[in-house]
């Protein structure tokens, strides 16, 4: 919206041209989303407290979590509001990627909202039944995959990129559709599983989004893309702004979500943010980098799969509790130690992921 106004008025006010620069819009997107979160955060927390929309704590969980019962949840509404508002304000709305990203984010957010609503407001212990949750996730992801496949204008948009290989970028064809499906649904549920401690999910999300901002910038510039042997996708430029909104909204939410948390994001936030990272990875053709940089999300998911599989087959548990962050709590680690160490691991993984762009 701002870009349109700036271009409309630039003939009379030339200084407005600065608002069309990608770098300026990205910084402003970060600051706008941050300000939105900080301004509306306290208001949302009071609203959630007033209507007793609070966290339900597992009785078999770590004892330190019992004090979290009743803490306002569904705070992901704040994150989605900040991302949507800032994106509509600072991104170029004639870029189809902007609308694809917002559709995916809000659709998965709606699924998470329904799950939270049933659990917290309607007091259904299991929330949205698992098969229905996966059904709607699958429908959304498949619609997204088909739209991206049919709207692709260059072969680069349907290639598969392998880190460490210069020339190995095979054309996927119809295989692109299941890749999109598993990336988006998998990422959504992985972030959801990680969101179990104060600030544990949001900060790695911010870090990965910041890295994807750089990757999207490089992908959208022909010289950088050719130099790094990555697909050249001009439309990816606006994903830099979108990633900026994630950083701003995430930091603003962390202000209230840091230990001890005043609010939790709930499924409305975690499912949406995971899907958002997934669709960005798909659009810049870097699904493998998402696995590397989001390694914490991957490990959390694998810990649940291994725990469930081991118990079903051997009647024995591998971890004291899954996801794995609860395992370390059960071992006696204080919650802040688990959180910060997982953050440190994410920083290392993000740096490794960025290095792979050059090491080929």
From Swiss-Prot:
Membrane-spanning parts: 27-47, 71-91, 98-118, 142-162, 168-188, 199-219, 236-256, 263-283, 288-308, 338-358
Claim: Isomerase is one of the keywords in the record: no
UniProt entry tagged with the keyword Membrane: yes
GO terms of biological process kind: cell division; cell wall organization; peptidoglycan biosynthetic process; regulation of cell shape
InterPro entries membership: Glycosyl_transferase_4, PNAcMuramoyl-5peptid_Trfase, PNAcMuramoyl-5peptid_Trfase_CS
Cofactor list: Mg(2+)
Record field: catalytic activity: UDP-N-acetyl-alpha-D-muramoyl-L-alanyl-gamma-D-glutamyl-meso-2,6-diaminopimeloyl-D-alanyl-D-alanine + di-trans,octa-cis-undecaprenyl phosphate = di-trans,octa-cis-undecaprenyl diphospho-N-acetyl-alpha-D-muramoyl-L-alanyl-D-glutamyl-meso-2,6-diaminopimeloyl-D-alanyl-D-alanine + UMP
Subcellular location per the Swiss-Prot or TrEMBL entry: Cell inner membrane
Family indicated by similarity: Belongs to the glycosyltransferase 4 family. MraY subfamily.
Record's protein name: Phospho-N-acetylmuramoyl-pentapeptide-transferase
């Amino acid at each position: 919206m701002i870009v349109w106004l700036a271009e409309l008025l630039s003939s009379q006010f030339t200084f407005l041209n600065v608002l069309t620069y990608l770098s300026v819009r990205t910084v402003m997107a970060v600051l706008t989303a941050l300000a939105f979160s900080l301004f509306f955060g306290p208001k949302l927390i009071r609203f959630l407290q007033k209507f007793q929309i609070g966290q339900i704590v597992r009785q078999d969980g770590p004892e330190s979590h019992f004090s979290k019962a009743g803490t306002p949840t569904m705070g992901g509404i704040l994150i989605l509001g900040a991302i949507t508002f800032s994106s509509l304000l600072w991104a170029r709305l004639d870029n189809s990627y902007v609308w694809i990203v917002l559709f995916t984010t809000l659709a998965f957010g709606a699924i998470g909202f329904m799950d939270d609503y049933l659990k917290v407001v309607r007091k259904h212990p299991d929330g949205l039944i698992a098969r229905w949750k996966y059904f709607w996730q699958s429908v959304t992801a498949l619609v997204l995959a088909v739209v991206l496949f049919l709207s692709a204008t260059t072969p680069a948009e349907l290639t598969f990129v392998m880190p460490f290989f210069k020339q190995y970028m095979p054309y996927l064809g119809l295989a692109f559709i299941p890749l999109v499906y598993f990336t988006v649904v998998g990422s959504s549920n992985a972030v959801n599983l990680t969101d179990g401690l104060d600030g544990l999910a949001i900060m790695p999300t911010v870090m990965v989004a910041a890295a994807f901002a750089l990757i999207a910038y490089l992908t959208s510039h022909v010289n950088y893309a050719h130099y790094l042997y990555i697909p050249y996708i001009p439309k990816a430029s606006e994903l830099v702004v979108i990633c900026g909104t994630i950083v701003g909204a995430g930091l603003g939410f962390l202000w209230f979500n840091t230990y001890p948390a005043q609010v939790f994001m709930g499924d409305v936030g975690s499912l949406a943010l995971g899907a958002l990272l997934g669709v960005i990875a798909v659009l810049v053709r870097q699904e493998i980098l998402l696995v590397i940089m989001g390694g914490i999300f991957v490990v959390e998911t694998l810990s649940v799969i291994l725990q469930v599989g081991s118990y079903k087959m051997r009647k024995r548990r591998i971890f004291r509790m899954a996801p794995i962050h609860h395992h370390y709590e059960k071992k006696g680690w204080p919650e802040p130690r688990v959180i910060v160490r997982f953050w440190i691991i994410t920083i290392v993984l993000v740096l490794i992921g960025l290095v792979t762009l050059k090491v080929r």
